[in-house]
């Protein structure tokens, strides 16, 4: 809007006219008296100044545009200044008496008296300045770039009052009090300042040097001086106008203000009373009223960016008073409803009060504007937050309210005003950090709400190792609800209200040695909660000062985030402290194996808990046992046990035994009388493909078994030579077989999901002796297995998958004997045997993408198996020499020795180990096999199905065989 024009200056009053001189007496005879001179005319009154013109309103809308202004964008024009009143005119001077005539023949007559002087005219009135026009700018999907942004015009000064005129003069030049000067004209009032409104519907706002919302109030005009006559008056000063209101509505977009954001214009100074000349007892004129500063209001509904370097809410009152008090400072209001915004500092209130006139009865006169900051949603981050100032008597109050969203500030100074946090569960104030997600505090709050079964109302987070001082008697504060209605000096009404949550960074205050909180004797509700963040290498034996009073939280309402540590409050005459002890893991981590629990307790006592450690073992254990990461204690146990027993979770040892004994079983089937494949002198070459599916028990946690599914396949290639009647009248068969295969174990139930991709290769030497119904078999074998285990952690752990590479070596030797009864229906073949096996597992390193999580030692385990059973078979001979032999085998296997592997696991940087191991074989196994052999000439082909069941495993396999007999 255009600036209002200044009013025209009032015209000065005209001076009184001088009287005419008395007439001269005639010469000669007795002349008559000279006639009286006429009175001088009165001076004319000065004209009233013309009013200033009104500024026009400006309205601009930008759509899909970009506006670059190399200077200042002003919305809302300044008011026009009131013009000065005209001075009163001076009184005129009296005329001289007439001159006596000269005697000639008679007596000369006397000259006539001079006429009286005229009065001075009154000064004209100063005119009112024109009003500044309002300015409105709307951005829709547009960008505005400017050096400075000013919303709300400045108020202007009122005009000065005119001086009173001087009294008239007598004929001799002396003062003639009967002839008055003119009255001084009053100064004109300043026009109204225009309001400014900027609305950002969407787009971008870039300001380099700062944003000012709310114009400054104008100064009052000074009164005119009373120069002489007590019966006259000087003109009064005109009133200064109030600053225009500045409003910023930011609906969505990006703001980047690299200067200050000032909300509220300063108040103007009052006009001074006119002076009274020396010796004059009258009262001089009054000065004009000062204008109040315009209010500044900013509302951010959505968006992101920097609001400014310094946010100043509330402006100072006027500096000086006259016959009236100075103007009030404009209030500053900043409201954030959503979005993500930042600044370097926030000062709410703390502006200096202006000067009040002597005897002022209005306590609010010349007061500085108060500052109001409200966060209803979203996030706001700043470096320093100050509420009010130390000089509580001479400055305005500040008000900070977090009713929703998260406010994070590095430093907080609560001096004068109010602070409240609450209104909904998400409302939170973080002090000591600008990280709104600091240390996953929201997860701790969510866990606590879940345990309590209700939402908490308002959260205060204290970190950074710096004391949060809320003890100022001029500060009213509360977290949560139900303490008191906020009003200054509420005393014990301050404190932690119903269902409030206070979160304290324990390690930060252990390290700094400072008390975390000064409350000034505040109260704590019986339902208020305290959550201790146990992290950053906090360990058993640490201690810190929590608060300066004893009105703390009830012991049942104090919770630590780590299940490895116990935090307790201790009060004495000086305040409340927190001690850190080792937790009873039988209570906090029920089901954890004793040796693992001892290892974790040792970590908590020596390394401490640290969810962000470079030591990945410490990080994994700390996160797994922290309520901010894993809500369920049972899940904590599962994750830790799965990670430290990754080999068992992946079924490494069980698979190594199964795939290592599988070739020996195929060799014995190849040599068994059950298949009745004729072997004459010469060489046999045989190939056996196989596929298996296994459902097996892996890791047992808290008495509950976890299971894995395994799918594997392999191929055996063997060859042997038969020597007829080569030993004790029986046939001797000797050969060797090579095996190769691969598979995968998938464990998803009851543990962290684990995959074991394994492969194996081996060699077996075997020999069989057969004489009539007797058959004895012996073998020795070696199998090497390679296992690549991957374990996926829950998403809440925010860690990459665990990996471990393991190698195993299985050596085995076995002996089996069988006898064949031939009946008219079938062959009945009972058998019995013994097998020795030794499994060696190399040491391994469990790791993730950041480093080592755990180290597992090597292990050596030896066990025996004793199989017994019976098989039946029958031959069917067809045309063309084809022989078909179906068979069925039922058996039982008992195991003794090391049926479980045993190793030790350790964490990086920590002395001490825990026991770990996995299932090798079950004590008792039942086996059923059935198949058919087809033989013709030199070829034989077989197919069988095997089923083995134990308490921990069910194994299904399909095996084929192809044999060629060289004769």
How should each PLM-predicted stretch be described?
Residues 1-134, 140, 145-147, 151-175, ...:
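Collagen-like Gly-X-Y triplet repeats in extracellular proteins
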Residues 131, 192, 242, 292-294, ...:
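Residues that define the transmembrane beta-barrel architecture of outer-membrane proteins
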Residues 61-63, 70, 76, 138-140, ...:
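Feature marks extracellular polysaccharide-active and adherence modules
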Residues 46-52, 85-92, 120-127, 161-165, ...:
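Extracellular/periplasm-exposed beta-strand and loop segments of Gram-negative cell-envelope proteins
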Residues 362-363, 379, 384-386, 390-394, ...:
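Extracellular beta-strand/loop-rich repeat segments of large surface/secreted proteins
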Residues 764, 838, 847, 854-967:
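Outer membrane beta-barrel transmembrane domains
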Residues 610-823, 827, 942-965:
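Outer membrane beta-barrel translocator domains of Type V secretion systems
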Residues 537-583:
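Solvent-exposed adhesion/ligand-recognition segments of exported proteins
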């Amino acid at each position: 809007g255009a600036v209002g024009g200044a009013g025209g200056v009032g015209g000065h009053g005209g001076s009184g006219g001088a009287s005419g001189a008395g007439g001269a007496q005639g010469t000669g005879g007795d002349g008559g008296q000279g006639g009286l001179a006429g009175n001088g005319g009165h001076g004319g009154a000065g004209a009233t100044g013309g009013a200033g013109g009104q500024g026009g309103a400006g309205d601009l809308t930008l759509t899909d545009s970009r506006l670059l202004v190399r200077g200042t964008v002003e919305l809302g024009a300044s008011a026009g200044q009131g013009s000065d009143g005209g001075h009163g005119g001076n009184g005129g001077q009296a005329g001289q008496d007439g001159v006596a005539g000269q005697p000639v023949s008679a007596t000369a007559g006397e000259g006539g008296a001079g006429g009286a002087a005229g009065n001075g005219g009154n000064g004209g009135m100063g005119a009112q300045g024109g009003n500044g026009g309002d300015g409105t700018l709307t951005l829709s999907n547009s960008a505005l770039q400017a050096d400075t942004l000013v919303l709300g015009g400045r108020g202007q000064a009122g005009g000065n009052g005119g001086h009173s005129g001087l009294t008239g003069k007598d004929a001799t030049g002396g003062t003639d009090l009967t002839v008055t000067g003119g009255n001084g004209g009053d100064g004109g009032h300043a026009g109204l300042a225009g309001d400014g409104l900027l609305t950002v519907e969407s787009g971008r706002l870039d300001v380099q040097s700062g944003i000012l919302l709310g114009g400054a109030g104008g100064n009052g005009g000074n009164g005119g001086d009373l120069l002489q006559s007590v019966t006259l008056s000087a003109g009064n000063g005109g009133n200064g106008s109030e600053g225009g209101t500045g409003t910023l509505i930011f609906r969505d977009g990006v703001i980047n203000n690299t200067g200050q954001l000032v909300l509220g214009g300063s108040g103007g100074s009052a006009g001074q009373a006119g002076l009274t000349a020396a010796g004059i007892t009258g009262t001089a004129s009054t000065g004009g009223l000062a204008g109040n500063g315009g209010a500044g209001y900013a509302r951010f509904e959505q968006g992101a960016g920097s609001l400014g370097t310094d946010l100043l809410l509330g402006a100072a009152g006027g500096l000086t008073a006259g016959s009236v008090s100075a103007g009030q400072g404009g209030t500053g209001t900043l409201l954030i409803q959503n979005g993500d915004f930042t600044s370097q500092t926030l000062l709410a209130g703390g502006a200096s009060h202006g000067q009040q006139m002597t005897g002022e009865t209005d306590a609010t006169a010349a007061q500085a504007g108060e500052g109001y900051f409200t966060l209803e949603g979203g996030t706001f981050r700043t470096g320093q937050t100050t509420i009010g100032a130390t000089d509580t008597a001479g400055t305005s109050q500040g008000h900070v309210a977090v009713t929703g969203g998260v406010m994070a500030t590095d430093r907080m100074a609560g001096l004068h005003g109010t602070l409240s946090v609450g209104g909904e569960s998400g409302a939170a104030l973080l002090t000591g950090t600008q990280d709104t997600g600091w240390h996953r505090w929201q997860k701790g709050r969510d866990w606590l709400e879940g345990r309590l079964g209700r939402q908490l109302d308002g959260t205060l987070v204290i970190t950074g190792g710096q004391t949060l001082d809320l003890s100022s008697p001029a500060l009213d504060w509360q977290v949560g609800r139900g303490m008191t209605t906020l009003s200054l000096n509420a005393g014990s009404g301050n404190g932690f209200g119903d269902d409030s949550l206070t979160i304290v960074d324990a390690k930060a205050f252990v390290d700094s040695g400072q008390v975390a909180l000064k409350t000034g004797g505040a109260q704590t509700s019986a339902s208020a909660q305290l959550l201790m963040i146990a992290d950053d290498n906090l360990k058993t034996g640490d201690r810190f000062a929590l608060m300066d009073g004893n009105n703390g939280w009830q012991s049942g309402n104090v919770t630590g985030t780590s299940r490895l540590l116990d935090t307790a409050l201790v009060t004495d005459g000086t305040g409340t402290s927190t001690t850190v002890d080792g937790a009873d893991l039988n209570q906090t981590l029920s089901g954890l194996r004793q040796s693992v629990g001892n290892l974790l307790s040792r970590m908590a006592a020596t390394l401490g808990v640290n969810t962000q450690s470079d030591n990945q073992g410490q990080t994994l254990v700390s996160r797994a046992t922290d309520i901010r990461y894993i809500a369920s204690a049972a899940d904590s146990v599962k994750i830790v046990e799965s990670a430290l027993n990754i080999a068992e979770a992946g079924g490494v040892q069980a698979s190594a035994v199964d795939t290592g004994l599988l070739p020996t079983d195929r060799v014995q089937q190849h040599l068994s009388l059950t298949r009745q494949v004729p072997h004459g002198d010469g060489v046999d070459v045989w190939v056996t493909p196989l596929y298996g599916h296994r459902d097996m028990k892996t890791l047992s946690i808290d008495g509950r078994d976890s299971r894995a599914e395994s799918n594997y396949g392999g191929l055996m290639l063997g060859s042997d030579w038969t020597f007829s009647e080569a030993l004790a009248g029986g046939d001797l068969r000797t050969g060797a077989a090579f095996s190769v295969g691969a598979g995968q174990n998938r464990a998803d139930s009851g543990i962290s999901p684990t995959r074991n991709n394994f492969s194996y290769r081996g060699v077996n030497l075997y020999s069989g002796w057969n004489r009539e119904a007797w058959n004895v078999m012996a073998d020795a074998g070696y199998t090497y297995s390679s296992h690549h285990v991957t374990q996926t952690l829950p998403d809440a752990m925010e860690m990459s998958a665990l990996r471990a590479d393991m190698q195993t070596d299985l050596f085995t030797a076995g002996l089996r004997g069988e006898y064949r009864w031939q009946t008219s229906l079938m062959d009945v073949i009972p058998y019995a045997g013994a097998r020795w096996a030794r499994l060696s597992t190399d040491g391994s390193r469990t790791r993730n993408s950041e480093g080592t999580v755990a180290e597992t030692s090597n292990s050596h385990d030896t066990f025996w198996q004793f199989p017994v059973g019976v098989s039946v078979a029958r031959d069917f001979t067809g045309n063309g020499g084809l022989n078909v032999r179906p068979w069925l085998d039922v058996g039982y296997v008992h195991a003794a020795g090391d049926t479980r592997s045993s190793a030790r696991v350790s964490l990086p940087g920590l002395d001490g180990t825990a026991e770990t191991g996995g299932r090798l074989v079950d004590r008792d196994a039942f086996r059923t096999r059935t198949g058919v052999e087809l033989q013709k000439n030199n070829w034989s082909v077989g197919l069988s199905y095997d089923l083995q069941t134990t308490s921990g495993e069910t194994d299904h396999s399909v095996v084929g065989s192809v044999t060629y007999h060289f004769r």
